[in-house]
Regions:
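Conserved pre-motif I regulatory segment
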Residues: 1-18
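Signature of the SF2 helicase/ATPase Hel1-core->accessory helical subdomain module
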Residues: 29, 35, 55, 60-63, ...
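Conserved RecA-like P-loop NTPase helicase motor core
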Residues: 445-458, 510-617
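A substrate-engagement module of RecA-like helicase motors
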Residues: 41-171, 178-181, 233-249, 304-314, ...
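Conserved RecA-like ASCE P-loop NTPase motor core of nucleic-acid helicases/translocases
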Residues: 43-52, 401-405, 476-487, 610-612
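N-terminal targeting/trafficking signals and adjacent low-complexity tails
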Residues: 610-638
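Conserved helicase motor "Helicase C" RecA-like lobe of SF1/SF2 P-loop NTPases
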Residues: 483-510
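A contiguous, basic/glycine-rich beta-loop/short-helix subdomain that forms a polymer-engagement track
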Residues: 137-171, 181-192, 311-448, 454-459, ...
Length: 638
């Protein structure tokens, strides 16, 4: 792997490399990358999806290499700017605390002030007390406020600017995918690099880059988001807000009007799409096909607000205050654009420099699963992102390495290459170092009913019985992967007491405990069982006895009614393709492989996998799932 990466870098080419768990993937790309970077005076950008991998790289793998390699190199992690405290914003907040915050928030602000004197890096992960999000959002680094001009310089005490300054002397820079695409936007015209003029990129956990880039290109807007920023400007009920630091009585009425119009607009959207008509959607999403489905109630008042906010600039008493004002102007301008684009579907009218229509966008309305009656979002997404990667990532005379344990379908890179526009990118696939035939046994119940709307109770009952049966084989120690939240919670209720009688604690995602805490508890309590949804199908690393049993409740096909899935399938069909075999099945197989990969993390690990979906043996496409993983013993349970 290291030789292949070094050869690719020397040739200034791009590479997809599938590297299974257990081969020492991070060392295999870091060693050649460091040598190449030092030799050619380049920077290595390592981008990951999970925080766990970032911390492993910066706290474990890189320090180890710094101690043993004969070449010296510096490495630094850069987090998103909102993770850093901005001392200037903090002082501005302290000076205006009476008009910005209530009593409890002022106490939290004072705690932050005292913490700022002792913290070494100023990141929120270093905070050792309960943090109020409202307070933190008022003092963290922001793009238009905490700039090099306002907070930089050789003697700066700004944590974010200091972190960026240290990057200039670093050979290896670790970021996450979201931050990479955010930073890349600002310098994408520089054809000699990505984040720096002379750099190259290694995307680890590369199976996630398409989704992250897609989310970055198409931001959403919710009723709660608009309300939040309006109340930060001025909260009439609490008599708090930024505008109280300026002569702005004439704007306060505009804000109240916008709050009312915001509620009315999103209420009308929800009512017309989800509560009336015979063809109303059954789920939480509704695709929008036509322009101007609702009147833009907020447009005039939003334009009025922006005009009035700009008129306040001469009244600002300091540069910090003007920067805060400008950030509000930027925020509301962006909201105005998203709203206008959604109602007029403007992205579908954009053409490239050859007057060719750009990729289609799909638009939809989404209800929050937590507050479906009140929080409504308007969303959009590109249907195909391959052009974006062709033009911006796989550029000539640059190098990008994309690596993951799951980039192929039945040992073939074609699907992943087509999705990312990397048809001409080099490819390499490594075999797993594990002996799956010795370490893993798969069980598949033959008679379990298929999930369907007309037999939910029967399916749920049988599924619960089989989960309980397989948990019993290993006496706990199981990760149970679901694709449906309601089903997971219902079965959790059914099994919790039964498992407790066997001294097996059941941990369930979505019960108020964070993902990281659930995993920590699961690792430490060897006999516990963890029920998880989408995020637990990947990025879970629990070597040893604690995870000896992986139970998949269903093959992980995407919900076919989701607007993005619908649009992607239509896009393929319109080109004469087969959307099931060219999109739905490959996506499910990749996720299936990710799920299977949770079980064996070390060559001493052993365990079982129970697949509680007999489509894998009854349907013609089932063989593609089993063929996508290493050969192991399979038992069909009668």
């Amino acid at each position: 792997m290291a030789e292949k990466i070094l050869s690719t870098l020397d040739s200034k080419l791009h590479l997809f490399i599938e590297a299974p768990t257990g081969i020492g993937k991070s060392f295999a790309y870091l060693v050649p990358a460091v040598y190449y970077a030092k030799k050619n005076q380049k920077k290595v950008i390592v981008s990951t999806y999970t925080i766990n991998l970032q911390e492993q790289l910066i706290n474990k793998d890189i320090p180890f290499l710094q101690n043993i390699l004969p070449v010296e190199f510096k490495a630094k992690i850069l987090k998103g700017r909102n993770n850093y405290l901005c001392p200037k914003r903090l002082m501005h907040a302290m000076e205006s605390s009476n008009v910005l915050f209530e009593t409890e928030e002022q106490v939290n602000l004072e705690q932050l002030y005292q913490w700022s004197k002792r913290t070494s890096d100023g990141t929120r992960s270093d905070i050792d007390f309960a943090l109020n999000e409202e307070v933190w959002n008022s003092v963290c680094s922001e793009r238009g406020i905490c700039t090099h001009k306002t907070c930089g310089g050789d003697n700066t005490n700004c944590f974010y600017q200091k972190a960026k300054k240290e990057l200039a002397d670093s050979d290896v820079i670790v970021v996450n995918h979201h931050l990479f695409f955010t930073l890349f936007d600002g310098i994408s015209d520089d054809k000699d690099g990505y984040l720096y003029r002379n750099d190259f990129v290694i995307f680890d956990e590369a199976h996630t880059v398409e989704q992250v880039a897609t989310d970055h290109i198409a931001p959403s807007l919710s009723r709660e988001m608009v309300k939040y920023h309006l109340l930060k400007l001025y909260n009439h009920q609490k008599k708090k807000g930024f505008l109280l630091t300026l002569p702005s009585l004439h704007i306060q009425a505009t804000i109240q009007n916008l709050l009312d119009l915001n509620t009315a607009f999103f209420y009308r959207l929800r009512r017309s799409l989800f509560e009336s008509g015979s063809d109303k959607p059954q789920g939480l999403t509704c695709r929008i096909y036509d322009k101007n489905i609702e009147e833009n109630l907020m447009k005039d008042e939003m334009d009025n607000l922006l005009k009035n906010l700009r008129s306040l600039r001469p009244n600002c008493k300091s540069e910090e205050q003007e920067n805060e004002l400008n950030e509000f102007i930027i925020r509301f301008s962006e909201m105005n654009y998203i709203l206008d684009d959604f109602l007029n579907q403007k992205k579908n009218d954009i053409k490239d420099d050859k007057n060719k229509k750009r990729s289609e966008f799909v638009y939809w309305v989404e209800l929050s699963s937590q507050k479906p009656e009140s929080n409504v979002s308007i969303c959009s997404s590109p249907v195909d992102i391959s052009d974006y990667f062709r033009e911006n990532i796989f550029r000539p005379n640059n190098s990008t390495i994309l690596t993951s344990a799951t980039l192929t379908i039945n040992n073939n890179f074609e699907y992943f290459k087509n999705r990312l526009g990397g048809e001409s990118v080099l490819e390499s696939r490594l075999d797993s170092p594990f002996d799956f035939y010795r370490q893993v046994k798969i069980y598949i119940p033959k008679e379990i009913p298929a999930p369907s709307k007309d037999m939910n109770s029967i399916y749920e009952e049988k599924l619960s019985e089989w989960i309980n049966y397989f948990i019993g084989i290993t006496k706990g120690k199981a990760l149970v992967l679901f694709t449906n939240s309601t089903l997971m919670k219902n079965i959790g209720k059914q099994l919790k007491e039964n498992l407790a009688t066997d001294n097996i604690e059941l941990l369930i995602q979505g019960t108020g405990i964070s993902r990281s805490r659930l995993l920590k508890h699961f690792k430490s309590d060897i006999n516990s069982v963890l029920f998880g949804l989408d995020s637990f199908w990947m990025g879970v690393d629990v070597p040893g006895e604690s995870l000896s049993n992986l139970i998949m409740t269903r093959l992980p096909f995407q919900v076919p009614s989701h607007p993005v899935v619908q649009a992607k399938m239509e896009f393929i069909e319109q080109k004469g393709g087969n959307s099931f075999y060219e999109y739905s099945l490959p996506e499910a197989i990749l996720k299936f492989r990710q799920g299977v990969g949770r079980l064996i993390r070390h060559n001493t690990d052993q365990g079982i996998i129970a697949i509680l979906d007999n489509r894998i043996i009854n349907k013609s496409y089932g063989k593609y799932f089993l063929n996508s993983i290493d050969e192991c013993e399979i038992e069909i349970v009668e």
